[in-house]
Amino acid sequence: MRNTPAISRPTPRLRATLLALALAATAGTTVAAAAPAHAAPRQDTTPFQGVNWADPRDNYADDPVVLSGLSTSDSYARTYAKASRVIAAFRANLGANTVRLPINPYTVNGAYWKSYRGVIDAASAQGFKVIVSYWEGTGANKDGLIDDEATYWPMWDTVIKAYQHNKRVYFEPMNEPHGYTETEWADTAAKWLAAYPSVPRDRVFVSGAGYNDHVTSVCADPRLKGTYLSLHDYGFWKDYATYDEWVADIKGRIGDCASRTVADEFGAPMTTGLDYNKPDASDNFVNYIQAATDTFRELKMGSVYWPGLRTDDTYSLQTLTGDPDRPWLATTNQSGADRLAWAWGRGRPVTR
């Protein structure tokens, strides 16, 4: 989802303070403890080449998240069938091999979980990597903090139990934890890792601090060693910047942590007619997309575009077509798809 990072971090509400005080205590979960799982050495994150599939509500919901093209009335079988076609279209149209999906307690702890699993299962069955990320709710709950630990931990217990042994499924404890300070967020991420020691570290995505807008602080925390780090970055965060300024800005958010970092959200308008295959120094978004994709390729970073599919979103790189029961996708901006392919190690550079 698209948010603008604040210059100064907001003050967390009282329950965040209580959480921070409680971090010294052992977290109780229903998942049995095991010896800590160790991550294999990695050289880069280029295997992650994907898109976000989103709820039209930007994934913020106080009820189950419903991905664009799906319905809570769909059975597991129908969800699986629809998702299979959407995933196949992501691969056919974009060459993607990764999809990032939202979850929340309403989705996982309720009746819809049986159907929603069809999305994860369909993607995994086609060889996709699946990043499952927790989103907070709306209104007062949309504050960058875990909404309710009494439902948060049972949610993750259920997800881990279902997918711990599926090596294609990855877990992101929270999307954009901007309500926490850098230290509080690192503490919270460490608590998650301690709660699920049997999950291999290289199956976990630790969000960058703030709006996922920098990974340098989580990268420096030894408690989070072996995990992937997730970065978010958007062109609208600046009114205007040159190509070179964008490159410098993005690299500053990554520091020397590129080998662990996946940009699992980045994006720009795709339905407004911009041509991302030609240099246009006057256009901030053209400068941004070219800088971002060049930088991810240079640093050998994986990237997951936001959004691959979200109904009525001008940033969406795909749009639904055909029979709603047999959905397919069309590309909204081929030049945007070309830049994404370039980030993933294919295609041609922009001639500057």
Task: Label each PLM-derived region with a short phrase.
Residues D55-N59, P105-T107, T138, P177, ...:
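Feature marks short, surface-exposed loop/turn motifs that line or immediately flank catalytic pockets
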Residues L145:
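Short acidic-hydrophobic catalytic motif
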Residues A83-T138, E149-Y152, L193-R201, S282-L299:
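Aromatic-lined substrate-binding rim segments of carbohydrate-active enzymes
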Residues L14-A16, A35-T98, A343:
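N-terminal carbohydrate-binding accessory modules
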Residues P64-Y80, A150-D157, K161-Y170, M174-G302, ...:
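Extracellular glycoside hydrolase catalytic/binding regions
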Residues A40-R42, V86-A92, V119-D121, T216-C219, ...:
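Short amphipathic alpha-helices and their capping/turn segments at secondary-structure boundaries
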Residues M1-A39:
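Secretory targeting and sorting signals
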Residues A40-R42, A125, R352:
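Post-signal peptide N-terminal regions of Sec-secreted extracellular proteins
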